Amino acid sequence: MKMLSLVSLAAALTSLLALAGCLQNNGADTVTVNGDVPLAYVKRSTSITMNPTDGTSSADGGDLIIREKSSASAAEHNITAQFTQGHGDASDPEVSYDGKKIVFAMRCPASNTTATVNGQPACTGRWNIWEYDLSGLPSGTFTGGSFRRLTASTSDDDVDPAYLPNGAGFVFSSNRQTKSRLNQANGQTYFALDEYERERVLNLHTMDANGGAITQISFNQSHDRNPVVRPNGDIMFARWEHLADRNRFAIFRVKPDGTDMFVLYGAQSPGNSFLHPRDMDPNGPYAGFVVSDLMPLSRSQEGGALMFIDAANYSENNTPANNSIPAIGGQRQATAQALNADRGVSTYGRVTTPFPLWDGSNRVLLAYRPCEVTKNGVVVSCATLTADEMAALNDEGMTDAQKAASPVQDNAPAVYSIYMFDPAKQTWLIVAAPPAGFMYTDPIALQARPEPNAAQATPVDATLAAQNMALIEVRSVYDTDGLNRMAEQMLAPADLPAGCSKGIATTAPTDTTDTRPLVADLVRMKDPADAAYGCAPARFVRAIRAVAPPSNVMGMRTAIGETNFEQQQILGYAPVEPDGSFKLQVPADTPLALSIVDSQGRAFQTHTNWIQVRPGERRTCDGCHSPRRGGALNSGAIVNTMPAALKTALSAEHQAGETMAALRTRLNPSALSLGSDPVFSDIWADTSRPGVSAKATLSLRYTGNPNPADDLATPAPTNGLINYPDHIQPLWQRPRGTGGANTCTNCHTDPVKLDLRNTVSGTGRLVSYDELLIGDPVIDPVSGKPVTQIEDGVPVVVRQPALVETSSSMSNTAGQARKSRLTEILFGQTLLAGSSALASHPNPPGTAPDHSTMLNTAEKRLLAEWMDLGGQYYNNPFTAGSGVRVVNSLDQATFTAQIQPILQTTCAAGCHQAIGSDQVTSTGASFRENRLVLTGSPEGDYGSVLSMISDACHPASNLLLMKPSTVPHPAGATTQVNAVLPAGSTGYTTIANWIVRGCPAQ
């Protein structure tokens, strides 16, 4: 078969696919190409919807296929037809290290009662892990092998299996959540949905070689997918990071026991979702490189660009391991012609599921589909389109409605074929083309490869493990990466104490390979005799855990509120020592976030990814948000310098290599425990020395402060769960001033300006909440109408900044309270809200009371905590009043049969798609504007729809019906005449009748 370049491939593939019948010839007379290898892949229906967000997508017609050679004319064999019988699916094959076994995921129908395993029905209707064993077959024979079903889930889904080395078993992704469902926030037990409130979360699990001892090893709040084992024995996988505005897949690594989890690449690099990562040949010229397909979060059928990632030398595209490596160069496209890694048309096609060969050839097996669209309903090659037609497909200024009216649509089936790609020669050899209505993906070479090293187990503290606790130590929060996300740029002049020109003293790095021009001068910052000691801004670390969205409940969207954040719980506080270190015990196997807090209880940063530690694990990090590969800043001579102005009783006990936090907690183990309040007393400064002053004592308690006037007079949160109606609204109604003259609700009752009363708005929430979190529309001075703009094909209303900022940006930027204009007004400081927020919400007039003195210390702490967490309406979904309740009468089967087709027709093709984030392109529609995410996944769409229902007894009052039956919808479609889903229409009535079935009275 002729080898093609990508340019000629794009033009020739249409005719190649037309020859698919010839390519499927199973005769013995095959074309043999030097270097051919046997391979396996999956055949799947093109009716399936594949997105990174959909971890268990399925459609009838899928099977595992083995092809005898990597040649288009070689024989192929359907291995699983006896189980699927045309009504099942297969995915995610992986080959054993000796090349003689295949582990894969298969969903075969429970209606198949003829296929058995150990005398029991083999098929459960759910995704399970299977193994096909060829080891007993003659060489060159691929049929007649034996099957093992390793898992037997009847209510869970197990996918993405891979072999662990040394016969240790398997790693796989599963939504069974064996531990996390028993250990949810506030003592609850339930299956967690992802952070779109759609699908049950897929986490990494391991099991032994016989399918036993299933253990959950990852605890992300959205999917962990595509695990494989690296040559060093680590597990590498794609992690969906979806905390606040961050919404992408990065490449992570972890040991098989779940310890030492950290990002490997892609948390802050161009592009959105790095999926299907695999190591290139460790003995070839690409040793240390990882191949991945980089794609958008939706609308590309999991296809994107083929990326070669220099993971050995870069932690991000612009973060080299040392200064001898170019500053930028962590990733590059492997193909000569660039493929589109974003949404829209990709002129040269898309790639998915790459598999690099480790045979010295440096070739990559992959699935590729050409650029095809439909024109007047007929599939055509993009090469046949005019320049204007191509431009229209990629015109971001067009609305979805305008694009839907075009005869040319980017909706052709994803007909992936299997290719052998040679990156050195830039040639493509077609290996297998699917029959009509199907795709081929997930190719793997059936050849032996070196077995990875067995990763050594991490030593754990048995005492901590028995308590289901772990330990985290950060050597210095000031040891940040080149993006300076915990550096001077995060501070405002108001943060600087009197006499300080900067908050963080800096110096040139002592490490000659360091890539940073300046680093924090920790020796000065921990010296009480130096002015830098009193200028350092970090005072506390706040530990937070996720409150996962429960499955099978309604009302979650209303309960969460106008925010990009999910619900969260504050676990407690610990001090940050003068050198920037902290050391604390935290719950194990729990999704955690850590925020560094200033002296007034406001976070410097938003921690937009979840971290975890296993029971008994002692986890040490060099710094915060720092994927650098260099040595720790707080080490060597720096960490071992004990300034003379420190108390001798402490400095004399210092041991080599100890941070100040390690020293303190060794001498006082109780300091390892989180406290419920941010309180501080300087134990370090030896004030008996001339010119040495201690840092001021801090007490930010809810109650019990030295001055009772600083205590809360309103209800305090319980167990770190802050609910706006219960804890924030009472602040506005608390009597203040003489005779209550300065009570907030005395003045702020104007709906046009600011209304802080506790009346209920049209959203079902308190008016004051919506007033604080939703900015007013920007009005065109000429027309007097709201200004609109197109975002991701959707017309949206342009709004002024809200008083409370709930958009984090995906780059771990400033804390929410510090970016909120409400904070600046009530603290009397200019922080990081910005000029546009100031213009929209100017300082109160001079005739008004001094707003900076209206709230006391505890009230300001509470308000800052609520804003930093994301401004949720409720953080406890199980509290009375949240509106969240379990609903069993609105079943998924009825939804899939009756409701989903209506939504797919009227809603899913437009704005209701997952929108990703990356470092280059704009975010697109924020989640506050796009809450109902519909991808075609029955489970996911069902979960998303339930979240939009809050009152089953009154269907018309629910967002699910109220929004699309109102004109305009979306709000920016100001010229819209007819509702998307008019009240009384057949679709509307069908949905309303389904909703009312969930009413307890029905």
Cite the ranges covered by each PLM segment:
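C-terminal motif of bacterial Sec signal peptides marking the signal peptidase cleavage site
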Residues: 18-21
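Bacterial N-terminal signal peptides that target proteins for export
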Residues: 1-10
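Sequence signature of WD/YWTD-type beta-propeller architectures
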Residues: 23-553, 557-559, 564-579, 585, ...
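Aromatic- and Gly/Pro-enriched helix-to-coil junctions and flexible linker segments
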Residues: 30, 34-36, 59, 125, ...
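Exposed regions on extracellular, virion, or secretory-pathway luminal proteins
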Residues: 227, 576, 584, 952, ...
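Compositionally biased, intrinsically disordered low-complexity regions
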Residues: 10-13, 905
